[in-house]
């Protein structure tokens, strides 16, 4: 295993780029909430890498977003959700959690996110919201 980190708190999915016009030129930028969350992931990744260089080989990444069940959910169904038999079918989209995680780990954990050959993304309910990222050496399927 190359890296395993847990970021406590409500996971933040990658926001769509925002656009502004200045002096007749359009400029795209990442929303502030997304930038702050990616900075938190970067700090955790730097600490977990402990001075090691970014990996320059194929990697397998697993991203799991744990979200709190809605308060409006009936108690019985809420318990089922926490046990794992009920899955979250709400927004934000699952892939946006992975985009935020991969962009934050880019050039810190792996040289470039093009080195990710396998990606497992999950969204689950939990009383303790968090995002977990695991990076392992890629499998040789040849």
Q: Where would I find each of the regions flagged by the language model?
A:
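Acidic, proline/glycine-enriched N-terminal capping motif
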Residues: 1-142
């Amino acid at each position: 295993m190359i890296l395993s980190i847990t970021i406590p708190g409500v996971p933040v999915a990658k926001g769509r780029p925002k656009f502004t016009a200045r002096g007749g030129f359009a400029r795209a930028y990442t929303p502030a909430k997304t930038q702050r969350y990616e900075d938190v992931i970067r700090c955790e990744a730097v600490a977990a890498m402990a001075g090691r260089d970014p990996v320059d080989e194929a990697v397998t990444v697993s991203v799991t977003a744990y979200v709190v069940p809605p308060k409006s959910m009936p108690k019985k169904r809420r318990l089922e959700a926490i046990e794992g038999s009920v899955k979250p079918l709400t927004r934000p989209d699952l892939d946006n959690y992975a985009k935020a995680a991969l962009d934050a780990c880019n050039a810190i954990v792996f040289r470039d996110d093009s080195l990710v050959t396998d990606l497992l993304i999950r969204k689950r309910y939990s009383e303790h919201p968090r995002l977990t990222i695991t990076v392992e050496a890629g499998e040789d399927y040849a």
